[in-house]
Amino acid sequence: FHAALDAGIHVGAASGRGATRVPQVFGGDKACCRTLLAANGMQVYLDDELVHEATIDRDALLAIADVTRGMEGCGLICFDGPQALVVTGRVEDLRKSFRIYAKTACAVSDVPEFPVVKANVFTPVDLERTQQVIEVLRREVPQVDYSLPMPGFINTTPHGWSKASAVDVLAERLGISPDQVVVFGDSGNDLEMLRHVPNSVAVANATPEAKAAARWHIGECADDAVAHAIAAIARGEWPFTE
């Protein structure tokens, strides 16, 4: 990232995490988070400035709470900064799906009154069951879009909003065209972004859907394939061939 920043390239994470939780991914290096798409594009930062923030309608969250309340092993969490608030379901079940969030989670009696930027649904850690819950939510609460980053966990965004929308906000702010953007992805919450951006890249360990959505393909995250690609771009090279 620092090589790209030194070359005058804006680079940052496009993460499902809220903005307050992204720096820990980079060992606390805030320079790597100055430009950022957080909470699945609900928060857009450019050079440390929050240039866009979306929220999820409270009535929609109340409806999701009603749906999940009757589902065994499932629940709704809303975030207050880094704090996960368990609206429905049990912290013990959240721990099975997302241990980091469960560490500091606390149960609350209702959907928060404050504007909610990030909310998730947790389910049993089983891909088929997670997909079943998504189908129920899409039918019962269609004003929200749902994506599947991993079994046991579901992302929520307002209908029609995704990381792709956030990329457009950032590109417009930078005054660049879509073909001047490169995005990397590996899972269900990256699909819209991978389909939308002409130079989209999937890593080798990506889901089949993410690979199919991407224009370019590189090695695995474990081999630092993304870092190598970014370093090459910083040197003025084009590292994508297939």
Regions of interest found by a model, annotated:
Residues F1-D93:
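Active-site phosphate-binding/coordination module
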Residues A4, S15, A119, L194, ...:
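Residue-level signal for inorganic ion chemistry
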Residues A19, N189, P208:
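Conserved Rossmann-like nucleotide-cofactor binding loop
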Residues P23-G27, E49-L50, I134, R195-H196, ...:
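Short amphipathic alpha-helical segments
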Residues V67, M71-F184, G188-H196, N205:
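Conserved acidic, metal-coordinating active-site core of Asp-based
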Residues H196, S200-E242:
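Asp-based, Mg2+/Mn2+-dependent phosphohydrolase catalytic module
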